[in-house]
């Protein structure tokens, strides 16, 4: 029973982190589509702030034992790759 609760908390924690990563991606898509260019300091500031916040969330979940460190790194890496591809598509690279 206790191990089922732990697994459930781990799954919920990772799902919440994935949702936060998706929110960052959506925010950047909206910003690129409607508001600013990727070279804009505001764009860079928003992206840096959001990515830093997510990395701190992941670190906290890892320290609590809710998320495996490698899974957390993979989540950040995947988001960075998606953001890079989005940036390249927007700038025509």
Swiss-Prot record:
Annotated InterPro entries: UPF0358, UPF0358_sf
Disulfide bond sites: none
SUPFAM superfamilies named in the record: EF2458-like (SSF140404)
Family: Belongs to the UPF0358 family.
Listed name of the protein: UPF0358 protein RBAM_014700
Organism of this sequence: Bacillus velezensis (strain DSM 23117 / BGSC 10A6 / LMG 26770 / FZB42) (Bacillus amyloliquefaciens subsp. plantarum)
Organism lineage: Bacteria, Bacillati, Bacillota, Bacilli, Bacillales
